[in-house]
Amino acid sequence: MTDGPLIVQSDKTLLLEVDHPRAGACRAAIAPFAELERAPEHVHTYRLTPLGLWNARAAGHDAEQVVDTLLEFSRYSVPHALLVDVAETMARYGRLQLVKDEEHGLVLRSLDPAVLEEVLRSRKSAPLLGTRIAPDAVLVHPSERGNLKQVLLKLGWPAEDLAGYVDGEAHAIDLAEDGWALRPYQSEAVDNFWNGGSGVVVLPCGAGKTLVGAAAMAKARATTLILVTNTVSARQWRDELLKRTSLTEDEIGEYSGARKEIRPVTIATYQVVTTKRKGVYPHLELFDARDWGLILYDEVHLLPAPIFRMTADLQARRRLGLTATLVREDGREGDVFSLIGPKRYDAPWKDIEAQGYIAPADCVEVRVTLPDAERLAYATAEDDEKYRLCSTSLSKSRVVEKLVAQHAGEPTLVIGQYIDQLDDLAARLDAPVIKGETTVKERQRLFDAFRHGEITTLVVSKVANFSIDLPEAKVAIQVSGSFGSRQEEAQRLGRVLRPKGDHGSARFYTVVSRDTKDQDYAAHRQRFLAEQGYAYRIVDADDIDGGVPDADGVLPG
């Protein structure tokens, strides 16, 4: 027995003692391969999963490193069977390889003939395979490249795709490094992606994912299709590319609800690409409109299901996914792995914070007690109404008013899910509100006013969760969300993580109704951030009148 912070159990769960002096080092060491499941105050539970281990393998970690990490931090002896299982699971990645054969074209090759035999006999994979040309090789039709990778992953034999990519139509793109340069982690992310061919780069919000995309484009020097979440995001990508690269306005097209421009660099929204008319996708032609050399997926954790199907046909093109979290609430992380590619780079948020590239954050959960009348209404409500009732309690509005007053003059975002609640808060705070029906032009006007300090408080619905660059937001107050969405929590914290001019820290408040579904969902949402090393302090709404001190005891204002 040693004094390690980790207990490794035979059911593949890892228990991390949060208050242990080496907990931070342990968390950083296990993050590349373990998945956080629960994060209460004192002991966090992680799990080893095949997908987590394969992602780690693809990102350059081997079984020996994983085993050494578990042995180094474990308090008790690690079950031998678990160590063997880790080694065997990681060895499954790459046992099958998709390669380009000069004579036969696309071929599935196996380093282990018995594995190939198993795959050939499987009812799921056999129809996707062609003629066996050698004891260790079988033909694959290029159109089945994506589907085959999905099926092989489900069979437990994730294929390493070494078949290469078409170069696409050449188009000169250079970074315009005029008074700025890529940060070291951005350069490393681009190199890892390029060497791997395709895959996902995971970086915190505010850490410059767009620049990683721009640098990848400069490396590819080819026509590029960029898929983004919404029109505002598309225009921000366009502005950033004009500022950071040699591209001109004529070379960048927007393919959205408003415009249908196809140019050497085309930025399209997920919504338009997945629009269906009479059972067909009329905008599918966009993927064949040019000989794209690179396809970029922004916020890859939000990729709609139809785009997975479209991406299965794009396996011969380089694909780069950008995201702050690989967590998908629909559980389709395996499809991201198979079709976009494995994780190529993942920077822990706290590491980038330590380098000064994102602001430190103080996360506070403010718990309110429902008044008797609301409590009774909640107790007697139908299950599907309960979350809305406790999320929109009037007690929350009073807490938000106090918090905004305490941070008067500081750029503050109030974020929520329910429009009537946000309209009420906007009226109470005398602040503008941005919601789904707000026009793109009006959104941009309000975002610009917020950036320039003309507005200090802005009330926003979930439309502001993604890709909205609000560099000056210093305080975020969350009143309601998409049930227990961890990805949403990460995005919302990201709104305030961009580095502050005064090197100060950001405040992230979550206002939660005590002893309700709201509290349960809040605990679930916080799991991802706990994995990144963010601790939530819990304060009572009755105790905030004099202000909520930060972790060092300093009051706001």
UniProtKB/Swiss-Prot annotation:
SUPFAM superfamilies: P-loop containing nucleoside triphosphate hydrolases (SSF52540). Its cofactor is Mn(2+); Mg(2+); Ca(2+). It catalyses: Couples ATP hydrolysis with the unwinding of duplex DNA by translocating in the 3'-5' direction; ATP + H2O = ADP + phosphate + H(+). A motif (DEAH box) lies at residues 298-301. Pfam families: ERCC3_RAD25_C, Helicase_C_3, ResIII. Residues 1-135 are annotated as: Required for protein stability or solubility. It comes from the Bacteria. SMART domains: DEXDc, HELICc. ATPase activity has a small preference for Mn(2+) over Mg(2+) or Ca(2+). Co(2+) and Zn(2+) are inactive. Residues 190-344 form the Helicase ATP-binding domain. ATP binds at L203, P204, C205, G206, A207, G208, K209, T210. Keywords: ATP-binding, DNA-binding, Helicase, Hydrolase, Isomerase, Magnesium, Manganese, Nucleotide-binding. One of its GO terms (molecular function) is DNA binding. Residues 398-544 form the Helicase C-terminal domain. Its EC number is 5.6.2.4. ATP-dependent 3'-5' DNA helicase, unwinds 3'-overhangs, 3'- flaps, and splayed-arm DNA substrates but not 5'-overhangs or 5'-flap substrates. Requires ATP hydrolysis for activity; the ATPase activity is DNA-dependent and requires a minimum of 4 single-stranded nucleotides (nt) with 6-10 nt providing all necessary interactions for full processive unwinding. The ATPase prefers ATP over CTP or GTP, is almost inactive with TTP. Monomer. Belongs to the helicase family. RAD25/XPB subfamily. NCBIfam families: repair_heli_XPB (NF045503). PANTHER family: GENERAL TRANSCRIPTION AND DNA REPAIR FACTOR IIH HELICASE SUBUNIT XPB (PTHR11274:SF0), RAD25/XP-B DNA REPAIR HELICASE (PTHR11274). Removal of the N-terminus decreases solubility and/or structural integrity of the protein. This is DNA 3'-5' helicase XPB. The lineage of its organism: Bacteria, Bacillati, Actinomycetota, Actinomycetes, Kineosporiales.
